[in-house]
Amino acid sequence: MNWLKSTLSAVAGTQEPIYGPEAIQPVSQQQTEDAPYTELTKHDLRWRAYQYTNVETQTYYAMADNGTLVMVQIIYSNIAGIHTTAQFNCKIFNTSGDGTPHIWFSDPLYNHMFDESMSSFAADNISLSLNEEGNAYTLKSAVNEGCLVDLTFNRAAPGFAIGKDGTTYFGTDPQNPWGSMRHMFWPRCNVTGTITTKEKVHDMTGRGMFSQALQGMKPHHAASRWNFINFQTPSFSAIMMEFTTPPSYGSTVVNVGGIAKDGEIIYAGTTNSATHTEASQDETSDWPEPKSIKWVWEGKTKDGKTVTAEVDGPLGPKLDRIDVMAEVPGFIKTIAGSVAGARPYIFQYSPQQKLSLKLKVGDEEFTEEGSMFSEATFIS
């Protein structure tokens, strides 16, 4: 019956047994003293399109000089090698707090395909292309006539993945992992272009970041909690992605993050933390909604200087609380819906009372106000 149980849990998302922390190989194990991270090449950025259960996402966050905050995302998912779907999401946040709903579009994509090098993606009325030099993505979408997207993200600092390949592996046999979680980042981008809605043309000239993720397993098997921050100041970009595994993998915390400036990664590594310093119980979701978070980065530059950085302070009123089960496409929901005890909610923030990045590199100290987008996700 065990094979049936594990197959069922892979496809239907039932709970996993307790394997313990030995059954996870965090990405930090790939780091060496002289190679804590890898600078990304064009080849690293290719879509994988694996033929087993996995979800691949390319997510672009834009913070326009005029204050507009946007997330655009392509999701490519394969369920048990039998069903492939692609989805395009675009969210224009209302940061004014006046109660006007965010502009949110989520559309299935049809006839999707990749170019020969697997670095560009297309489907009916949408294309995402990586240029020849591998330093700019252009996204054009007319999938939904209510939201016409024409954006270019130019890499302003090198991209990075932690260790050799940015991947945490799951499984009791490290040589044959049964699951994985990978992240790659362009922490600092210059954004140009527009998003046209029925109401107006949004000029998106400004700053941004790009995150590529690949979950080679059921999302709720890999993580029970997530914390994410994208913090952009005139001179620096600070990003962090942290997840905590369910008890089946020892409630292990995996944290990847980095700090960049134009042309340079100052630090990238795993010795970072995200601490919810204040929270209150959210009645709708029954999760402890964070009110204040302290983000800390600690490590060394390439040439051995000590780096410490923090962003700390009140998050202000949340932008949004997303009931994931209400949002996900139907097919994925039926597969995820049988999860015992999973109640996935995402809380999103962008403090309008701006917070500051405090950064110390060697003996030099910097403090700069910045634009922030962050998420706290609770799953189980």
UniProtKB/Swiss-Prot annotation:
Record-level GO BP terms: ER to Golgi ceramide transport; response to oxidative stress
Family: Belongs to the SVF1 family.
Membrane topology: Peripheral membrane protein
GO cellular component, one term: cis-Golgi network membrane
Function: Ceramide-binding protein that may transfer ceramides from the endoplasmic reticulum membrane to the cis-Golgi network membrane, and is thereby required for the biosynthesis of complex sphingolipids.
Keyword Lyase: no
Protein name listed in UniProt: Ceramide-binding protein svf1
GO MF entries: ceramide binding
Keywords: Cytoplasm, Endoplasmic reticulum, Golgi apparatus, Lipid transport, Membrane, Nucleus, Transport
Lineage, uppermost ranks: Eukaryota, Fungi, Dikarya, Ascomycota, Pezizomycotina
InterPro entries, sorted: AttH-like_dom_sf (IPR023374), Ceramide-binding_SVF1 (IPR051385), Svf1-like_C (IPR033394), Svf1-like_N (IPR013931)
Location of this chain's protein in the cell: Golgi apparatus, cis-Golgi network membrane; Endoplasmic reticulum membrane; Cytoplasm; Nucleus
Pfam families: Svf1, Svf1_C
